[in-house]
């Protein structure tokens, strides 16, 4: 944790903040991209949300209190940015979040950046049937292999509730895959 404190100090100091922020980008760009991509599904939208995430991190690093890990704090920002983006996109299109997600899934098949096979696509369709929170928990646990404690810090939910949510999500996905 001491190393993180030193790193945050470098992010805050005018003489070292640009170099430190470059390091932050190198360290977290790929995992945050994957996290956001799991939520918004579209490559171009993911790039936009990722850029907004790093802008918010840079603008708000001075407000980071150190109550959680920097990683968790940034993931929370990325999660909120991605969910807000989806809500705004659905609102602009005059459709519900569920309908917007279905449209995104339909586009996923033709997305040149989607490297999954038919099984992966079926899994994404199964995940899309889950409530938003269960989707988020499932994706963070299954795809990103985050620990429950890390997810707890990111989504501000107890570990017990996360375990229950993940278990329910797995059951629903299994059921969907059996039927389809």
What residues fall within each predicted segment?
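Hydrophobic-face residues of short alpha-helical interaction/recognition segments
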Residues: 32, 36, 61, 74, ...
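Amphipathic, Lys/Arg- and hydrophobic-enriched alpha-helical face
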Residues: 25-43, 60, 127, 176-179
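Structural recognition of an alpha-helix C-terminal capping motif at a helix-to-coil junction
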Residues: 48-55, 68-80
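Internal acidic/polar
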Residues: 1-6, 92-116
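Arg/Lys-rich amphipathic alpha helix in sigma70-family domain 2
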Residues: 63-65, 79-96, 168
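Sigma70-family region 2
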Residues: 13, 54-69, 89
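N-terminal module of bacterial RNA polymerase sigma factors
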Residues: 1-30, 38, 179
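A short pre-motif secondary-structure segment
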Residues: 137-141
């Amino acid at each position: 944790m001491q190393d993180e404190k030193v790193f945050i100090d470098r992010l805050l100091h005018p003489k070292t903040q640009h170099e430190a922020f470059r390091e932050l980008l190198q360290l977290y760009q790929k995992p945050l991209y994957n996290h956001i991509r799991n939520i918004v599904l579209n490559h171009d939208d993911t790039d936009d949300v990722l850029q907004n995430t790093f802008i918010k991190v840079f603008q708000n690093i001075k407000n980071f209190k150190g109550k959680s890990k920097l990683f968790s704090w940034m993931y929370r920002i990325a999660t909120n940015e991605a969910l807000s983006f989806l809500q705004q996109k659905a609102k602009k299109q005059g459709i519900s979040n569920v309908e917007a997600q279905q449209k995104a899934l339909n586009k996923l098949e033709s997305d040149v950046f989607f490297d999954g096979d038919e099984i992966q696509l079926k899994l994404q369709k199964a995940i899309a049937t889950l409530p938003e929170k269960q989707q988020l928990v499932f994706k963070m646990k299954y795809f990103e292999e985050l620990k429950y404690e890390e997810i707890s810090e990111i989504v501000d939910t107890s570990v017990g509730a996360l375990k229950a949510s993940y278990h329910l999500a797995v059951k629903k996905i299994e059921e969907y895959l059996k039927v389809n």
